[in-house]
UniProtKB/Swiss-Prot annotation:
Protein location: Plastid, Chloroplast
Function: Introduces a cis double bond in the acyl chain of an acyl-[acyl-carrier protein].
Name the UniProt record assigns to this protein: Acyl-[acyl-carrier-protein] desaturase 3, chloroplastic
Binding annotation for Fe cation 1: E139, E178, H181, E264
Domain of life: Eukaryota
Cofactor(s) required, per the database record: Fe(2+)
Cofactor note: Binds 2 Fe(2+) ions per subunit.
EC class name: oxidoreductase
Residue positions binding Fe cation 2: E178, E231, E264, H267
One GO biological process term: fatty acid biosynthetic process
SUPFAM superfamilies: Ferritin-like
Length: 402
């Protein structure tokens, strides 16, 4: 899971309690950044003095909104998940490993292979390196994402750390597959000699220490919608990075990014299947959860990215990705439209309450609305002066146009 962010500016979420939804509470924990728009650098709050705290703060977050009776839904789907979702995982012995894509240190030609890798990587522009590093850093924050899945209510979390439920097995095995992504990209970038690995490693440590808040309220309906969206977005991002690498003459890097993108696509299919099943068995609550998730907008998992100096690092990384077409506001709109169609939201009829029908209308309107916003933003960008450049510590402080 990795992503840049490209959403229109959104004011901070205020503290609020729900009057429906099974004992919602407001958490005092400060864990994530407010949304920053692509094309701008954001407006971050200065870093506080607390050690290991996120570098900018947000209001307290709503937690535990899932009605207690909804646990029965996931209990009833345990067998279905074992039969339908676990087969999306690949056996370890049949899975690719990072070493399959890297020079073999046991080989007498190891030095020559590394030299060839470095020669290919020498042609990668700095802005492409920024996107590659940003994606890799996000992949390396995997402990945060597994933790996030295990905060969900409804009986889907891994209660013991080695639980035997299909939901627990999926979470651990999914994380094990995802773990290879950051490993591979990290080692590849190290071998290129093009980036400041100490700065990259600091960024990873800061990001894992800061955590994230996907605004899913510990609700697995919202959580699985969020993960479906993120996996699809990640597949798009890595796929576009692969195409950029190929155009700049690094076919090996293109294969690396393409391999990661294929994994993300498979994981997307699994999470999308879970949500499709929820639409089948509980359409009213599921469409309302979809609308709640989209009203908050999908907060990107690396939004608290920080390298120890640049308070605007994530916004700048996202701006570069938008400019290069690695992940854009148009992609965000396209994902909404795809998921609305994938889950048959326009055709929902039976079983919807008045609130459910309003949620249906809202969700179905989002894709076209975001596309219109993106078109206006593109027109404004054409009339605007060239974007400023900013230094990135990942590439030894060199300037990259935003």
């Amino acid at each position: 899971m990795s992503l840049t962010g490209c959403l229109p500016p959104r004011p901070p979420c205020s503290m609020r309690r729900r009057t429906s939804g099974g004992g919602a509470s407001v958490s005092p924990v400060v864990v994530m950044a407010s949304t920053a728009g692509v094309g701008g650098i954001g407006n971050p709050t200065p870093r506080g003095k607390k050690p290991f705290a996120p570098w900018r703060e947000v209001p307290p977050q709503v937690t535990h909104t899932l009605p207690p009776e909804k646990k029965e839904v996931f209990d009833s789907l345990e067998g279905w998940a074992a039969d339908t979702i676990l087969p999306y995982l690949k056996p370890v012995e049949e899975s690719w490993q990072p070493q399959d894509h890297l020079p073999d240190p046991r080989s007498p030609s190891f030095g020559d292979e590394v030299a060839a890798l470095r020669e290919r990587a020498a042609g990668l522009p700095d802005d492409h390196l920024v996107c590659l590093v940003g994606d890799m850093v996000t992949e390396e924050a995997l402990p945060t994402y597994q933790t996030m899945l295990n905060t969900m209510d409804g009986g889907v979390r891994d209660e013991t750390g080695a639980g035997g439920s299909a939901w627990a097995v999926w979470t651990r095995a999914w994380a094990a597959e995802e773990n290879r992504h950051g490993d591979l990209m990290n080692k590849y970038l190290y071998l290129t000699g093009r980036v400041d690995m100490r700065q990259v490693e600091k960024t990873i440590q800061y990001l894992i220490g800061s955590g994230m808040d996907p605004r899913t309220e510990n609700d697995p309906y919202m959580g699985f919608i969020y993960t479906t969206f993120q996996e699809r977005a990640t597949s798009i991002s890595h796929g576009n990075t692969a195409r950029h690498a190929g155009r700049h003459g690094d076919a090996a890097l293109a294969r690396v990014c393409g391999t990661v993108a294929a994994d993300e696509k498979r994981h997307e299919a699994a999470y999308a299947a879970i949500v499709a099943k929820l639409f089948e068995v509980d359409p009213d609550y599921t469409v309302r959860a979809f609308a709640r998730m989209m009203r908050r907008k999908v907060a990107m998992p690396a939004r608290l990215m920080y390298d120890g100096a640049d308070d605007r690092l994530f916004a700048r990384f996202a701006a570069v990705a938008q400019r290069l077409g690695v992940y854009t506001a148009a992609d965000y709109a396209g994902i909404i439209e795809f998921l609305v169609a994938r889950w048959g939201v326009p055709g929902l009829a039976a079983g919807l309450s008045g609130e459910g029908r309003r949620a249906q209308d809202f969700v179905c309107s989002l894709g076209p609305r975001f596309r219109r916003m993106e078109e206006r933003a593109q027109e404004a960008a054409k009339r605007a002066p060239p974007a400023a450049a900013a230094p990135f510590s990942w590439i030894h402080g060199r300037q990259v146009q935003l």
